[in-house]
Amino acid sequence: MGQAFSITPARRLSGEIAVAGDKSISHRALMLAALAEGESVIEGLLPGDDPRSTAACLRALGAEISGIDGPSVRVRGVGLGRLHEPADVLDMGNSGTTMRLMLGVLAGQPGLFCTLTGDRSLRSRPMLRVVSPLRQMGARIWGREEGGRAPLAVWGEQLRAIDFVSPVASAQVKSAVLLAGLLAEGLTSVSEPVRSRDHSERMLRAFGAEVLVDGTTAAVRGPARLRAQSLRVPGDISSAAFWLVAGSIVPDSQLLLSGVGVNPTRTGVLDALAAMGADIAVENRREVCGEPVADLRVRSAPLKACTIGGEWIPRLVDEIPVLAVAACCAAGKTVIRDAAELRVKESDRLATMARELGRLGAHIEERPDGLVIEGGHRLVGAGVESHDDHRVAMSLAVAGLVATGTTEIADPDCATVSYPQFYEHLARVRQQ
């Protein structure tokens, strides 16, 4: 158990922040570079625990990766279908994205045997949503609960293309199937009820794969051949969300968040905060390596309640913990619904946020698929727990900026999973 993090109310927040590189894009950049022919250069890669887990797995499979903690990461790929059999178990750490996407990468490598595991949290998370469609393609995957929980064992096979209809909008499911489809003969497609984030489709196309998108259906034609690329990873809007909320609720604040990815499949947090009355300007829009990027300027503003649900959820699911903090400071009753997926993240984020914000005095009701938050009640500093969940830890730190007294967050270091510089940036922008 690490040392607790203490936070007291901020008088104001000001300054410019270059938020950490996008976690979702960082994973995909490493994986596709490892599967490509030649040497790729990736700038702005997130230097967090999760991408390190991905890099370690790819090294064990034969890719050469250097400079993982520096500004430019170099990856010499092995080419599709040429991964090496690892000598040991592949440890995914805490990264669900690594495990689910690597299942798709490994399933179509004929004759390759791998065992995948992770930490206690990851071993409890559901994997059948990915394993089932891969099995439909001919994958041989075994594990606890009939392949529903790690550790998982994979024996690579020649896969067949399928048309998969996903019951949920999940970028991880979609990406795993599309990655497996790179080595299957023909067109592999995934249809979703609502379009999930599309980083995989954009990046696969950049690396030379034939990708087709029609509404909520994405498809890839195999067998494919990937070519090395030079990439820049934009700032993570999920990390920017902490500052968007903090800058909104701390009085007299103004923050500029530079170089943030504003992919429309990820900008639900901007829509939700706009509905709550936040003062956020999207400036200097541009495109970087196929991804839309902008600078975000946030100024403090009185917030009002809104309803968050439906088609918004896939576009802001990772930001719901910090949006719950915003709701505590908004006038009226905010309803968050259709978010049962949060129960199977690094923690049960609905239960966790209800419990921990309740400790700070929030009027919050947990529901099976969401939260109901009666805003406008003053938060009071107290001891709270991160539950070893990076987004919970950082959300509680944002709450501590407006809670009276001192808020003590137990096990705060889990923030390094997605935003290693978070506490450093917090110290820099707060004005005592």
UniProtKB/Swiss-Prot annotation:
GO molecular function: 3-phosphoshikimate 1-carboxyvinyltransferase activity
A GO cellular component annotation in the UniProt record: cytoplasm
Localisation per UniProt entry: Cytoplasm
Record-given protein name: 3-phosphoshikimate 1-carboxyvinyltransferase
Presence of keyword Transferase: yes
Job description of the protein: Catalyzes the transfer of the enolpyruvyl moiety of phosphoenolpyruvate (PEP) to the 5-hydroxyl of shikimate-3-phosphate (S3P) to produce enolpyruvyl shikimate-3-phosphate and inorganic phosphate.
Subunit structure: Monomer.
InterPro entries, per the entry: Enolpyruvate_Tfrase_dom (IPR001986), Enolpyruvate_Tfrase_sf (IPR036968), EPSP_synthase (IPR006264), EPSP_synthase_CS (IPR023193), RNA3'P_cycl/enolpyr_Trfase_a/b (IPR013792)
Residues noted as binding 3-phosphoshikimate in the record, renumbered to the chain: K23, S24, R28, S170, Q172, D318, K345
Main localisation: cytoplasm
Biological process terms in GO annotation: amino acid biosynthetic process; aromatic amino acid family biosynthetic process; chorismate biosynthetic process
Enzyme Commission number: 2.5.1.19
Domain of life: Bacteria
Catalytic residues as annotated in Swiss-Prot or TrEMBL: D318 (proton acceptor)
Reaction catalyzed: 3-phosphoshikimate + phosphoenolpyruvate = 5-O-(1-carboxyvinyl)-3-phosphoshikimate + phosphate
Species in which this protein is naturally found: Gloeobacter violaceus (strain ATCC 29082 / PCC 7421)
Family label: Belongs to the EPSP synthase family.
